[in-house]
Structures are given as C-alpha cells and as structure tokens.
Amino acid sequence: MKQPLHIIKIGGNVIDDSEKLSAFLRNFSGIKEPKILIHGGGKIATELAEKMDIPQQMIDGRRVTDAETLKLITMVYGGLISKNIVAALSANGDTAIGLSGADANSVLANKRPANPIDFGFVGDVAAVNSENIDKILQAGFVPVFCAITHDGNGQLLNTNADTMASAIATAMSGNYESFLYYCFEKKGVLEDVENEDSVIPEINPSNYEKLKEEGKIFQGMIPKLDNAFSAIQKGVKAVHILQAEDLSSLILTKRAYGTRITA
C-alpha cells in the first residue's frame, strides 16, 4: 500500500494576512505524514512593485512578467515569502526547506508562446522531477515550493501556483497516494459568491459544466477547478478546495470540509 502524501497549495488572502498565515502553518505542522507546500504571493509582489515604481500589467487577472517583474517576484516569492514560511515552520518543529522549481531541477517549464498574448517570462509546466522531490522527502525535509520554475537553459519563469501544485501531485502519485488541497480564505467553492455558506460539497465533470453554464462558478475559480480535474484524471487520489483553517481537521478527522472534486 502506498504511503499518503499531502500536497497543499496556500494562496488567496491567507498569504497576505500574517495572523491567518501563522494559524494555517501551525495546522500544517500538525500533519505528520509526508507533505509538500506550494505558495503564491501575488498581492505582496504587486505592493512592492508599486513602491519600487515597476509598472505592472494584468490581463484577465494574470500577471505579465517582464524582465524587471521577474526579478521582483523571484525576490518576493523565493526570498521574502518563502523564508518567512520556512522560519515559521521551523519554529513549529518542521524541518522545512524553501525551494523553487529550479532547485534540484524539480520543476521544468516551457516559456509560454507570445501568441495570442505575450505574458513575458511565464512558464507552463513541462516536467516534474519526482525522483529528486522524493529524495528530499525521504531525507526528512518538508519541501516548500514557490511558483518559480526554470526552462533547463538557465531561464527562470513565473508559473501559476495552482498548476504547479497539480503537476507535482500528479507526478508524485506514482510512488505515493497523493492528496491535493487548494487552501484559501473561502470555505470552498461557493454557489453564490455573496453567501459564504453556499459551499458546493462536491463537483464532478457533469455538474461542473452545468454550474458554469448557469454562471455559478466565477471566472477566477475556473482555472483552479480545471487543475483539480486534471490531477484527479491523472492519478491523484483526492482533491479538495477549502478554507485554510479547516485543512488539518479534514486530514486528521476525515470529516467533510470544503469542496471535494471527483471524477
């Protein structure tokens, strides 16, 4: 029987709120089975860009990453946010190690084509080195990945953290029973964005299409759900989208929290 591996992506406003992030990391440290954390950090990068007078361009909510912005997000994601998370986890007793996809050649990506939209130094995941990530886990470390990858030729690339989490969970499912969790400030996928209690308990391919047709899945959630379905279809045991504070309760008690994605 394969050993469970928990792959958790933390994002949304939780990263920007020090108290919420600290609470989440305490809960994360309570998970004693092998685990991997993937984090974003867009809001902090945007705030620093304004202070440093680095113009930012967003297209449909996605950041255009020019050369100066790439330097900035590498410093913010791989430096400030990564090291703060690692320091907090170390204080909690976890032997955490902050990584990017370039470290240990963990996540390789292809630069996104300039047509139809040129997003600059943005990469789409091409390969995950599950063998090297497994070596890190076997050595007793807790990998903490920021959403920076590389192209194998020395170029760093900005990569969607949700996609990176899905790709890592999929790659690790060969050796582990992979469980993927998308944690943010909401209780799950909401049928009504104005009603925090309108959590959809389960989404499958059939009701997903229906919910989209009815306009009940807001635009920003669709890429996350697409990544979730991709993971399920490629061998990940289970995918949950839930409130960050409910993570340890879901894993430790097996009770239903948030939205479960099923095939």
Describe the predicted segments one by one.
Residues M1-A263:
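C-terminal catalytic "cap/lid" subdomain
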